[in-house]
Amino acid sequence: MNFFLAIILTIVYCAIIKFVPVQFIFSTVGVVILAIIFDAIIVNIGLGVFNLIPLPPLDGSKVILPVLPYKAKYWLQNNEQIFYTIFLVLWVTGLAGKFISPIISWLASQILSLGGFIFGL
């Protein structure tokens, strides 16, 4: 859902750039509106990437658990609290961002490029 919302917001963002008069885009209100939409795009991509991390207790683990062998599934479920602690430490220290940020940046550039392509920007 987050990726879908990011794509919809990208279409809105590019449509504003394409069809709204330049005077409005460069006005204070226009800049603020575009900044809010752009930030919403990045936040939704970030949430989408975060949701796909395949470690318990995150949502991505629910995607991979059905396809894992029984022993791996059992091990992941029994060690969920350890993964939670590890992930919390990585997040608090900022190390998680070092892995996630490049993915978010790449996806954002791809989605924005798609929007630019659609609107001929």
What are these regions (language model features)?
Residues 1-121:
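Hydrophobic transmembrane alpha-helices and their immediate loop junctions
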